């Protein structure tokens, strides 16, 4: 996992020094992937002094090797959530993921991040006829939950499928470009600091008076 299509597509991912001295902050975030940097972005906007620690260079792990899709469709997740919990739980999951797509879009717009964001339809397909009913039940359920999914039998894939569930209004982007944009937004106020090649080996609990 050394090569990354996304990292290779940009001139340079921003680099940062190693933490080699004691520092104080309001919040310390471990990991500078999309999750960690998104948390840092919102905290910085609130004026909270934040330090982000990354054991490698930014974008070298999960984010740099991601599928680059931004979607609320994760396999046949909603049937699983309904069966394991209930409809309300499944609906909350859907709404949270759909809101996340819009949050990313809003960050891109507000911070003027050029990261090739575009809305797309996302698909989960099957190649076995025995699984068609599972797909159709997922379509029915997700429509009940509030997304206009639909069933298809034809695709542009280079192999035959028996069917697929399509989720409209999903998205894709270049995660490396997005990370660079997030970083610029985080460090421009000097409220937050990022340190790479810094491994966290232990976390100690402390008494906090809030």
Predicted segments, located by residue:
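Extreme N-terminal leader/targeting segments of oxidoreductases
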Residues: 1-27, 45
């Amino acid at each position: 996992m050394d090569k990354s299509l996304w990292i290779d597509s940009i001139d340079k991912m921003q680099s940062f020094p190693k933490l080699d001295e004691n520092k104080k902050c309001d919040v310390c975030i471990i990991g500078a992937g999309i999750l960690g940097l998104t948390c840092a972005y919102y905290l910085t906007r609130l004026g909270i002094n934040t330090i982000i620690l990354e054991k490698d260079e930014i974008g070298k792990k999960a984010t740099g090797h991601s599928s680059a899709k931004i979607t609320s469709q994760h396999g046949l997740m909603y049937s699983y959530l309904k069966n394991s919990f209930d409809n309300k739980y499944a609906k909350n999951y859907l709404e949270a993921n759909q809101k996340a797509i819009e949050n990313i879009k809003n960050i891109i717009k507000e911070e003027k991040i050029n990261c090739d964001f575009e809305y797309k339809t996302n698909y989960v397909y099957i190649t076995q006829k025995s699984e068609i009913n599972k797909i159709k039940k997922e379509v029915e359920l997700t429509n009940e939950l509030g997304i206009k999914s639909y069933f298809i039998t034809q695709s542009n894939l280079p192999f035959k499928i028996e069917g697929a569930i399509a989720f409209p209004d999903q998205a894709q982007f270049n995660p490396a470009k997005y990370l660079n944009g997030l970083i610029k937004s985080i460090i421009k106020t000097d409220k937050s600091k990022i340190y790479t090649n810094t491994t966290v080996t232990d976390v100690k609990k402390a008494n906090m008076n809030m």
